[in-house]
Amino acid sequence: SAFDLTVIPTFAIGCAEFFHPADEGWGPRPVPKVCGCPELAWHIAQSVIEDEFDLTIMNDMVVDHGLTVPLSLLFGQPQAWPCRVIPLAVNVVVYPSPSGRRCYQLGKAIRRAVESYDRDLNVQVWGTGGMSHQFQGPRDGLINSDFDSAFFDALLNDPEKLAEKPRIDYLREA
């Protein structure tokens, strides 16, 4: 993970010029550094903080598999990624994690921030941290495709209802 257990922010936004791949125990992944967009990241941070969200500002941040693997799946193995990225880390590692409602509201606040920005840029905001896998215990490697399909349908068709789903349901079902 990009964070160790000494500091785990609930929400953190990367505001740096670039982000190096994290060493997750086997050395950093052999992928390009991720180029950021500090001017837009700072605009988003200021906007969502004014919108009552407390973000941890990361001026130096490494990015883990939660960002570098999806980038690799989308773009292969280029010498440099074809887009700039603003990483947004969400604590899903230790209790207490934010509720679905809180994450949904933050997503809406980020959208307002991006829409209010006065420049036309090619930048992606990536939220990392999620329910896609558990590395230990009896559910290690389990994929619940029925839950996943229902989740993605609800994400598109009824995000308000999905935002009310209790955290424990994700732990049991995802």
Language model region names:
Residues 133-135:
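Short, solvent-exposed loop/turn segments at secondary-structure junctions
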Residues 110-115:
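A short, acidic, amphipathic alpha-helical segment used as a generic capping/interface helix at domain edges
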Residues 1, 88, 121-129:
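Beta-strand elements within well-structured catalytic alpha/beta cores of enzymes
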Residues 5-105, 116-119, 137-174:
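Flexible, D/E/H-enriched segments
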